[in-house]
Structures are given as structure tokens and as C-alpha cells.
């Protein structure tokens, strides 16, 4: 999306301090981490290909260990269409265990302010591979997100589902101007990612939250 000619300049990735855990370090060099004063020090990883590059023209917001501060930045961007007449598309990516469990009141306030954007609860679930063990094993963040009326929550299993949901969210929030924001949980587990089925109404069923993955009558499963 950042590389898209029409949308790219409006997309802002936000992380607290876990960009490498989520495999986002490639963005450091490509788009830079925003700093109002630029790079003032030599980072420890300066000799690596994907080093920690800060820039006055950086796009990514790397806020450090502060979920509240990161969510505040997301809210500012998610409401800029109203407060500054400038539509932005923020993606806040965080450990799902440290999302709604820590900033639920801010998420509720964002809903009241009619925020629009995407929250990505990464390394979610009880079986995903986390770097710090059980304290990161989230299995209940969707219960919390479901209490916010204008937060639409999804737990996709496959990449094509994620793509369909994000495309639908972009259309709903920014084209149709509906007042929702999206919470999506993703994992880092290794399993087969099948191609998108060529079945009728597949996109519609993904958005509804239920699709036919296999059929008992099929000779072979996907």
C-alpha cells in the first residue's frame, strides 16, 4: 500500500518497539523512521543491511515501549480526516496481548471520535511463536475488541483473507465514509498458505466471517 501511487502518501505504519519481531525491519531503509531532528546517533545495527534509519522525511512511527503513546499517535492520524481535513490511513502493529488489554479505554475513546484505520494485533493466539513466552500468548483480545460498537474485528487464517478484509475496510471507511475502524489479528506460524478459492461469493463470505474452505463431496481438499 505504501508503494501505491494513489494511496501511498497517506499510509502510516506505527509500532511501539517490536518492528523486527514482526518482520518489518525492511521498512527502516525503504521509508525511514520519522524523527523531527533526523538521525542524531549511529545505531548499533549500522553495519547491517536493514539498519535503524531515522529521518526527517521518515514515514514509520517507532514510538518505543509505550502502547498508550503509540495508540495516541494512531488516534491522531485516524481522526485527521475530521480535525485537519486530511485523510490518513494508519496501521498500528503491536503484540496483541499488549493491545486492548492495555489501551482499551483509548480504543473506546477513538471509537467515540469516529476514528478510521487499522489495528493489527500481531503474534496473536495461544500457539503462535513468541519471543518471550507465555506472557505474550493472547487468546482473548477479540473479546475486548468486541465491546466497542464501531470496531470491526477479524481473525483471518490465510493471506488472501487478510487482503480481502483490508480492501473491504479501505472501501468502507474511506470511500463509503462509514465510521468504523478495524482490528485484525495475525500470527507468525508457518503453515501452508493456499491460493484464494475460486468459489462463488468468496469475498462476501470472508467479510461475513465464514466461508467454505473444504467440502465433504470434494475429491481433494485444498
What is each PLM-predicted segment?
Residues 1-194, 201-206:
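Thiamine diphosphate
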Residues 213-222:
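Single conserved hydrophobic/aromatic residue that forms the stacking wall/gate
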Amino acid at each position: 500500500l505504501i508503494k501505491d501511487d494513489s494511496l501511498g502518501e497517506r499510509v502510516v505504519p506505527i509500532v511501539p518497539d517490536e518492528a523486527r519481531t514482526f518482520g518489518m525491519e525492511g521498512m527502516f531503509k525503504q521509508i525511514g523512521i520519522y524523527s523531527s531532528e533526523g538521525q542524531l546517533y549511529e545505531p548499533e545495527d549500522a553495519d547491517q543491511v536493514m539498519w535503524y534509519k531515522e529521518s526527517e522525511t521518515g514515514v514509520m512511527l517507532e514510538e518505543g515501549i509505550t502502547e498508550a503513546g503509540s495508540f495516541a499517535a494512531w488516534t491522531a492520524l485516524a481522526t485527521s480526516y475530521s480535525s485537519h481535513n486530511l485523510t490518513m490511513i494508519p496501521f498500528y502493529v503491536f503484540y496483541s496481548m499488549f493491545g486492548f488489554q492495555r489501551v482499551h479505554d483509548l480504543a473506546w475513546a477513538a471509537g467515540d471520535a469516529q476514528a478510521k484505520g487499522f489495528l493489527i494485533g500481531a503474534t496473536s493466539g495461544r500457539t503462535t511463536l513468541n519471543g518471550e513466552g507465555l506472557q505474550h500468548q493472547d487468546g482473548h483480545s477479540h473479546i475486548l475488541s468486541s465491546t466497542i460498537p464501531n470496531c470491526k474485528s477479524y481473525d483471518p487464517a490465510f493471506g488472501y483473507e487478510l487482503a480481502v478484509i483490508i480492501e473491504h475496510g479501505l472501501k468502507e471507511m474511506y470511500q463509503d465514509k462509514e465510521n468504523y475502524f478495524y482490528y485484525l489479528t495475525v500470527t507468525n506460524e508457518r503453515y501452508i498458505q493456499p491460493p484464494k478459492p475460486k468459489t462463488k461469493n468468496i469475498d462476501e463470505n470472508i467479510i461475513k466471517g465464514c466461508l467454505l474452505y473444504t467440502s465433504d463431496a470434494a475429491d481433494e481438499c485444498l
